[in-house]
Amino acid sequence: MIFTLLGLALVATKSACIAHVFILQLGALDMEALATPLAKVIATSARALHTRSLRASERDKCTNLTARSTRALLAHGPRLRHAVQQQAVAALFTIAVARRRRTA
């Protein structure tokens, strides 16, 4: 419960990328209970990649952490709800688009 509340609090902050360091430390915990709040954190930071206020170094860091967090969440795929899986895949697509724009 504490982790869920902390995850939701991190979503509310301006820089959602901070949450990913926290997410990556949760691998050994019960991902089924934490999947929905973590998916919201991932979706929020994926949207943050489109803001122009991020510097290039912040955007790169956010992109990499979002991708790692999403893969960690999807590693528990069969046990997660379909909606959470869809959110995670959508975040990976957003990351791919952001990376393609940066290199183009």
From Swiss-Prot:
A motif (RxLR) lies at residues 52-55. Residues 1-19 form the signal peptide. One of its GO terms (cellular component) is host cell mitochondrion. Its main location: secreted. The keyword Glycoprotein applies. It is found in: Secreted; Host chloroplast envelope; Host mitochondrion; Host nucleus. It comes from the Eukaryota. Glycans are attached at residue 64. Keywords: Glycoprotein, Host cytoplasm, Host mitochondrion, Host nucleus, Secreted, Signal, Virulence. Has the canonical translocation RxLR motif, but lacks the canonical EER motif, which characterizes most oomycete effectors identified so far. Belongs to the RxLR effector family. Secreted effector that completely suppresses the host cell death induced by cell death-inducing proteins. This is Secreted RxLR effector protein 54.
